[in-house]
Amino acid sequence: GSSGGRGFTGQTEGKAETMNLKQAKELVRGRLSDKRYEHTLNVRKMAVKLAKRYGVDEDKAALAALLHDSAKEISKDEMRAIMRAHPELAEGGEERPTPVWHGICAAILARTEWGVEDEAVLSAIACHTAGKPGMSRLDKIVYLADMSSKERDWPGVNKLRKLELKDLDLAMLAALRQTNDFVLSQGKPLDPMSKAAYDEIKAEVDARAAKAG
């Protein structure tokens, strides 16, 4: 069968047409549990709020947010099959910790089955779990919106919600530190991309502070 492509059928001459926000919403509604669907709508709301604040395209933020967890509820085997079918899009995902797989797979499905061609949107979907070096503002917004959406209640989330409206990079450092500490505390492997993202943003923030000081 097809690798998790149920839901959206915008096929025209074998090539899916570009998915709009309404279609994306319907697609994830059919692919996710109620709880995760509610999380997705909360992430969309937060991503649009941050996009507004930082002058980023709100529709791109909304689309990336709607699709970010679209592959979260398929099996590891199905994720592996999707990455193997599209090695050129899989970003070496199979070698990386499994929590990042669903983002990579969502981006692959969005590109290959759902007609999403916008590289910025696909990037934000793919890197929303661990981050990566060279993150765009849209990448950062979706990463942060996922961590700070309305239903999240981890210790420190309110601080992050305030910080992300003031300074995107300081918020990213706090968020990456939080995630990386959590992963390590569970004895799980840290995604190398996550460490690279943290080191790069930290260097930029330090350079900015040195300039200002």
Model-flagged regions — what are they?
Residues 182-213:
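Charged phosphate-binding loop/patch that engages nucleotide di/tri-phosphates or the phosphate backbone
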Residues 25-30, 48-176, 208:
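Divalent metal-dependent catalytic cores for phosphoryl transfer on phosphate-bearing substrates
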Residues 39:
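N-terminal glycine-rich anion-binding loops that anchor highly charged ligand groups
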Residues 33, 52, 130, 181-188:
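Generic secondary-structure signature for well-ordered alpha-helical cores
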Residues 21:
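Conserved N-terminal diphosphate/IPP-binding helix and adjacent helical/loop segment
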Residues 1-18:
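Short, Lys/Arg-enriched N-terminal segments with co-localized hydrophobic residues
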